[in-house]
């Protein structure tokens, strides 16, 4: 008979989840997308079932969930409350890779009352990052130490040899989400004080971050790191920063786009018809003409450059993007989405290219006798040509493992769960390492 698992979503992460679960004889997977063809493409390799489903249709959702033991929600997090409400009605367990949102938190009493397990935050970031943060923090506390600082940086990037464009970045999914994240403000603990960075200044705060000599990384902070003092039970920490890794040159390039207003998503007539890029920029920036010289003069009046060399590099990058050419824009009604269409044309992964995931935690430890120690936990993982991308594997495998453990009772509620305790984390870590070779290398560096 076996257990029934429903997977919602058609993103690039879904494939390893479906394939991994369907490889178990006692698990039957159904893939549900709004578009049946998408579900069929994902279900085909494993011979799983595919259906069309609109998650905003409560009765249709309830009907499908009632036939399943667990639902995996890999759709945008704004739809999770809808899925969880249906799961409460149908008494179905839930797994997601997203952060627990305030909207889900509000449903917690009903989740507990229904007796279901809703397991969240179990991908890469959030997910694998929690596993190894909690592990070291728990070890330090048990040994009588204090955690004085916690830095955590993660990046999904092209492998160095495939980072061959001016941004040093490629898109394995929608570029919109990547660019929107660059408009967030940031908040973190630094030396016992909360520091904030406005969205306008985020790229300007990026600084080099050393992990291994072979990589030229820069880092900048993510949204709100202050919450992790409580979530990781480290009230003693004076510095708590979680952030993003990119290759050097990325922040300055993005900052110039921000200065030009290219990350704005308010409706604009200029980007609503298929005119040439140089004409669109002339109108948008108020340049004298469509000549490259006049367009650059307009950019110069809006952007602030680090130095002449950086200016040359970024402007030649804009030329590579075709912003000064008479190539037609793909009109999307605003600057951001029109730019996204261009980036997605030029910056996709080719079939023979690999992505790379880098994650590092840095722990500043103070022992009871006053001595200090610095430890790192580091993951560098590459995608497989002809197989899963690293991002798909490092998000997908933890989701699949967590689902299996919810099914067999290793992870058990009822309630809203996330990987913040050794009881939940240790079995997931073990399976990730033993079965898939995914683990963080732990070192004492000082």
Curated annotation (Swiss-Prot):
Similarity comment: Belongs to the saccharopine dehydrogenase family.
SUBUNIT field: Interacts with TRM112.
Gene assigned in the entry: LYS9
Organism, scientific name: Saccharomyces cerevisiae (strain ATCC 204508 / S288c) (Baker's yeast)
This enzyme's EC code(s): 1.5.1.10
Chain residues that bind NADP(+): 10-13, 33-35, 54-55, 75, 97-98, 124-126, 174
Recorded coiled-coil stretches: none
Protein name in UniProt: Saccharopine dehydrogenase [NADP(+), L-glutamate-forming]
Protein keywords: Amino-acid biosynthesis, Lysine biosynthesis, NADP, Oxidoreductase
MF GO annotations: saccharopine dehydrogenase (NADP+, L-glutamate-forming) activity; saccharopine dehydrogenase activity
One Pfam match: Sacchrp_dh_NADP
Protein's GO biological process: lysine biosynthetic process via aminoadipic acid
Cellular component annotations (GO), alphabetically ordered: cell periphery; cytoplasm
Catalysis performed (reactions): L-saccharopine + NADP(+) + H2O = (S)-2-amino-6-oxohexanoate + L-glutamate + NADPH + H(+)
The keyword rRNA-binding is annotated on this UniProt entry: no
Miscellaneous section: Present with 57500 molecules/cell in log phase SD medium.
PANTHER family reported for this sequence: ALPHA-AMINOADIPIC SEMIALDEHYDE SYNTHASE, MITOCHONDRIAL (PTHR11133:SF22), SACCHAROPINE DEHYDROGENASE (PTHR11133)
Residues the record lists as binding L-saccharopine: 98-99, 125, 223, 244-246
Pathway it works in: Amino-acid biosynthesis; L-lysine biosynthesis via AAA pathway; L-lysine from L-alpha-aminoadipate (fungal route): step 2/3
UniProt key word Disulfide bond: no
């Amino acid at each position: 008979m076996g257990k029934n698992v429903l997977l919602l979503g058609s993103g690039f992460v879904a494939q390893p989840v479906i394939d991994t679960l369907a490889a178990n004889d006692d698990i039957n997977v159904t893939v549900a997308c709004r578009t049946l063809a998408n579900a069929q493409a994902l279900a085909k390799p494993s011979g799983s079932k595919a259906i069309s489903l609109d998650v905003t249709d409560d009765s249709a959702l309830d009907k499908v969930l009632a036939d399943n033991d667990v639902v995996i929600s890999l759709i945008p997090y704004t739809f999770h409350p809808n899925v969880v409400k249906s799961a409460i009605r149908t008494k179905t367990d839930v797994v997601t890779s997203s952060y627990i949102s305030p909207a889900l938190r509000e449903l917690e009493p009903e989740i507990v009352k229904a007796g279901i397990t809703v397991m969240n935050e179990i991908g890469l970031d959030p997910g694998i990052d929690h596993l190894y943060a909690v592990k070291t923090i728990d070890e330090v506390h048990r040994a009588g130490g204090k955690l004085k600082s916690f830095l955590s940086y993660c990046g999904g990037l092209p492998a160095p040899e495939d980072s061959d464009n001016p941004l040093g970045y490629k898109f394995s999914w929608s570029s919109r989400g990547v660019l929107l994240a660059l408009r967030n403000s940031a908040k973190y603990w630094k030396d016992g004080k909360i520091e904030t960075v406005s969205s306008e200044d985020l790229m300007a705060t990026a600084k080099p971050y050393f992990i291994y000599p072979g990589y030229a990384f820069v880092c900048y902070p993510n949204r709100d790191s202050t919450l992790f003092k409580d979530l990781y039970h480290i009230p003693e920490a004076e510095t708590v920063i979680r952030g993003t890794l990119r290759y050097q040159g990325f922040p300055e390039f993005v900052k110039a786009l921000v200065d030009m207003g290219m990350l704005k998503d308010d409706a604009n007539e200029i980007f609503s018809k298929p005119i040439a890029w140089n004409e669109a920029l002339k109108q948008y920036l108020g340049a004298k003409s469509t000549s490259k010289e006049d367009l650059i003069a307009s950019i110069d009046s809006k952007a602030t450059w680090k130095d002449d060399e950086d200016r040359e590099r970024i402007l030649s990058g804009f030329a590579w993007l075709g912003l000064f050419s008479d190539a037609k824009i793909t009109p999307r009604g605003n600057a951001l989405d029109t730019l996204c269409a261009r980036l997605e044309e030029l910056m996709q992964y080719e079939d023979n290219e690999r992505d790379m995931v880098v994650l590092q935690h840095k722990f500043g430890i103070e022992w009871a006798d006053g001595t200090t120690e610095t430890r790192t936990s580091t993951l560098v993982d590459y995608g497989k040509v002809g197989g899963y991308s690293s991002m798909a594997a490092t998000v997908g495998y933890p989701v699949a493992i967590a689902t299996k453990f919810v099914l067999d009772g290793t992870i058990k509620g009822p309630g809203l769960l996330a990987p913040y305790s050794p009881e939940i984390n240790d079995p997931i870590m073990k399976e990730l390492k033993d079965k898939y070779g995914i683990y963080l290398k732990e070192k004492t560096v000082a």
